Amino acid sequence: MTKIVFMGTPAFSVPILESLIEAGYDVQAVVTQPDRPVGRKKVITPTPVKEAALKHNLLVLQPEKISGSPEMEKVIDLAPDLIVTAAFGQFLPEKILKAPKLGAINVHASLLPKYRGGAPVHYSIIEGEKETGVTIMEMVKKMDAGAILSQRAIPITKQDDVGTMFEKLSILGKELLLETLPKLIAGEITPIPQVEEEATFSPNITREQERIDWQKTAEAIDNQVRGMRPWPTAFTTYQGTNWKIWAVTPLTETTTSAPGTIIQRSKKALWIACGEGTVLQIDRLQPAGKGQLTIQEFLNGVGQNVAEKDKVD
C-alpha cells in the first residue's frame, strides 16, 4: 500500500484528502497550517483540513514554518512513498521534496504554466478567462514550476465566482488525482516540462486591487467582482465610505458620462458609468458596518440619499 503524507489547508483541499482515504491509500500524516483567529471575535479556529483529518483519526502536524521544523523531520522519519499537496500555503524545502521515493506532487487550481502562485482561481476570473482547470505536477524548489503529470480543463461561466469555481475545481482535482496516482506509482507517466516563456503569475490579491477602477469596462468590473467573491470582495468609495460590491450586471446601454458617475437612480436600480461608455447595474452591495443588501433594500434604506450625478471612486 502506497504511504502518503498529505499537505493542505483550506476547504478546497478537503475532498482531495478524503478521496485518498476512501481510495485506500495509507495516509500517514496530514500537515496543515496552525490554528488561526477567525472572524470579528478572533476565535481560534482549526483549518478545514485539520478538522477533516481528525475525523479520520489521522496524525496532524501544524508547523508555523515547515522548513527546519521538528514537523519536517517527523515527515522525513515517516518515510512516505509520496507527498501530495493541495493549497498547503507554504514553500517546501528541497530536503522534504526529495525524501519520498516517488517525490512530491501538487494539485494546483489552474492550467499551468498559467497562473502560478497563491490565487489562481481569482485571477482566472478577473482576467476574463473562458476556462481554467487543475494541473497535477511534480514539485520543485521553484514555485509551481514542476513538470506536468496530468491536466484537465473546465469552463468558467458568467455565473461563476471564486466560491463556485473552488467547489468545481476541488471535485475535478480529486478525480484527476485518483486517475493519476496509479499511473504514477506504476511508472507509466512521462512528465511534461512547463514552457517557462508561457508562465503567468497569480500573487495574493492586494487591498488596492480590491478597489474598483471605474475607468475599466462594465464587463471587466463584473469579472473583478466575481473574481473576488466571496473573498476578498471588490469595493468602491462613495462620499468617503466604502461599499463592498457583491453582484453586478453589465448592461447593453451606453453613456457619455464620466466613469464613476451614477447615471440612473430609482427605487429599484442604480446604474454607474464605466470605461468606454459602458454601463454597470449594481445588484447587491454592503455598506460599511452593515450586512449585504439588495439594491432595492439599500436605495430605500441607508442609501436613500444617493442621487444621480453623484460619483463613486
Swiss-Prot record:
Keywords: Protein biosynthesis, Transferase. It comes from the Bacteria. SUPFAM superfamilies: FMT C-terminal domain-like, Formyltransferase. Its EC number is 2.1.2.9. InterPro entries: Fmt, Formyl_trans_C, Formyl_transf_N, Formyl_transf_N_sf, Formyl_transferase-like_C_sf, GART_AS, Met-tRNA-FMT_C, Met-tRNA-FMT_N. The keyword ATP-binding does not apply. Disulfide bonds: none annotated. It catalyses: L-methionyl-tRNA(fMet) + (6R)-10-formyltetrahydrofolate = N-formyl-L-methionyl-tRNA(fMet) + (6S)-5,6,7,8-tetrahydrofolate + H(+). The keyword ATP-binding does not apply. (6S)-5,6,7,8-tetrahydrofolate binds at S110, L111, L112, P113. GO terms for molecular function: methionyl-tRNA formyltransferase activity. PROSITE patterns: GART (PS00373). GO terms for cellular component: cytosol. Pfam families: Formyl_trans_C, Formyl_trans_N. Coiled coil: none annotated. Attaches a formyl group to the free amino group of methionyl-tRNA(fMet). The formyl group appears to play a dual role in the initiator identity of N-formylmethionyl-tRNA by promoting its recognition by IF2 and preventing the misappropriation of this tRNA by the elongation apparatus. Belongs to the Fmt family. This is Methionyl-tRNA formyltransferase. It comes from Enterococcus faecalis (strain ATCC 700802 / V583). The gene is fmt.
